Amino acid sequence: TASGKDMVYCDKPNCTHEGFSGSNEKPSCPAAFYGLEGAGTVLYNDHLYYVGNMSDEDMTVQYLYVMDSNGENRKKAAKLENVQNVTAVLYRDNYVIGAYSNRIELNDEGQIVNDDKPEAGIFVIDLDNYKVYMSDKITSEQANITDIYYEDEVVYYSTVRFGDDVTELMIEEGASDDAESFAYDNMLNGIYQYDIADEKTTCLTEIDHINDLRLLDGDGYYSSKDGYFVFDTESRQTRQLPIDADGKTQYGPLKKSGDFLYYALSEEKSDEVTYYRLKDDKSEELMKLSTEKAFSIASICGQSVYVTYTNDNGKLCLGVISLDELNKGVFEPKELRCFDDEE
């Protein structure tokens, strides 16, 4: 999407492009990969990189695969031990930065001895020498990394977990009664800092009774029953944002581009969604749309704004508009793909 150009994964003449499967674990097509979507193949510095485990030899190990830009000459360059599920990956300043989560514990013979040991953390791989760095882990029920951000040899990441006194049974019972209220009352949201050079993990803050913590440009944005707030990771101070949400519900996630914070609110007694951008504590209304035509911002990458919306045929779709169109209040998305009902 950055260049607007297609790239070749496989340039083999007459290749059938067979995929990876349990019966075909070594496909001849160099474009075949296997793993979670959050850790897909990335073209970076004229090489293809992929984080995953294509051999399934050990469910607690993942690898960094490096190959030519067309997928040929694939090799394992780094090993991530005690990493079960890679959930997100960034490539910055010749580093591979990723988040992972674990659930099970194995003994030395590879047998499961505990199927409920949730933990999560981040890893960093130096592409100059393939050295692996690992942060401290967070633990307790539903421990997970929700966002990662890199700047100047430091990784910031947001976490979510239940308090240490919350058991799996309590979560099941709470979810059956009122899952949203139970999560609001018992979930802990944290922001951590990992210094690569010092190999040091620091918890900057951990907050309870909030909604949807987002790590935007390294700072933590969130809402609660008291309003909207931002936690500055440099000063470690929290301040309230001048967003009037009385009688309104947030529609979609908060997003940032440059100095602007983008947000949308739907009024409880209206079928409209209003879109805003905030800068220097001043909000500007961008557009109003009916709830049937409304969209959520999935991400903002440069001048491209990726959105999810329902098309005229009632299908949930991923599309793109320009940042200039968003700022002018124009919503005429280019449809990229539509999702099936089971997706």
Where do the model's predicted regions map?
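Blade-level signature of beta-propeller repeat domains, shared across WD40, Kelch, NHL, RCC1
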Residues: 298-343
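A short loop-to-beta-strand structural motif that recurs across blades of beta-propeller domains
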Residues: 63-65, 121-123, 190-192, 227-229, ...
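Repeated scaffold domains used in trafficking and secretory/extracellular systems
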Residues: 20-22, 28-42, 82-93, 141-152, ...
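Short loop/turn segments that connect beta-strands within beta-propeller blades
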Residues: 2-4, 68-72, 126-130, 195-199, ...
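Post-signal peptide N-terminal segment of secreted/secretory-pathway proteins
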Residues: 1-74
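A short beta-strand motif characteristic of beta-propeller blades
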Residues: 7-9, 15-32, 73-79, 131-138, ...
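Residue position within the beta-strands of beta-propeller blades
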Residues: 49-52, 97-100, 156-159, 221-223, ...
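Short, conserved, GDST-rich strand-edge loop motifs in beta-rich repeat architectures
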Residues: 53-58, 101-117, 160-186
